[in-house]
């Protein structure tokens, strides 16, 4: 895609990966340097943290569909603009339609913006279950943030437990 300028600074687009009919879809903000180099979603230390969180719920990575709101990394890891998010919106919408997950875990503010078109603070969005194309959306903190802010891991775990309860319902 060359819909916005992000394509110029990336090595490759990170489209998504995982089970084609997964119950869980995890949507991150944007690929980072680790993902751009590896060519996979949620790579590096943040990916390892996400894998551990999912394993704690009994979910191997292979049973989850992983993607990002943006398909290209942003320069220096800066936050995405609303225009950049809008350029990738159709890809994300199509992924949700194809996978048909039972729950979407939106990990980060950009992921929440892409799915919910909301500019509310992440702390407020994570307090209630939202919806995208009829699929419940649980908003939580991104793994890279949790690596820097250990105190919020308990909140993220609570959010994952809410998502798990929606899948089991």
PLM feature spans:
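A polyanion-binding, active-site-adjacent surface
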Residues: 1-169
């Amino acid at each position: 895609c060359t819909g916005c300028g992000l394509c110029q600074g990336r090595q490759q687009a990170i489209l998504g990966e995982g089970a084609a009919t997964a119950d869980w879809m995890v949507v991150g903000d944007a690929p980072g340097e680790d993902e751009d180099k590896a060519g996979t979603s949620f790579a590096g230390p943040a990916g390892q943290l996400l894998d551990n969180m999912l394993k704690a719920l009994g979910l191997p990575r292979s049973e989850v569909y992983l993607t990002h709101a943006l398909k290209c990394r942003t320069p220096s890891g800066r936050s995405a603009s609303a225009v950049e998010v809008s350029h990738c919106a159709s890809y994300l919408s199509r992924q949700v339609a194809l996978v048909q997950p039972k729950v979407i875990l939106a990990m980060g503010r950009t992921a929440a913006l892409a799915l919910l078109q909301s500019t509310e603070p992440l702390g407020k969005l994570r307090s209630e279950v939202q919806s995208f194309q009829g699929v419940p959306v649980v908003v939580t903190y991104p793994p890279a943030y949790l690596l820097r802010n250990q105190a919020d891991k308990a909140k993220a775990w609570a959010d994952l437990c809410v998502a798990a309860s929606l899948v089991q319902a």
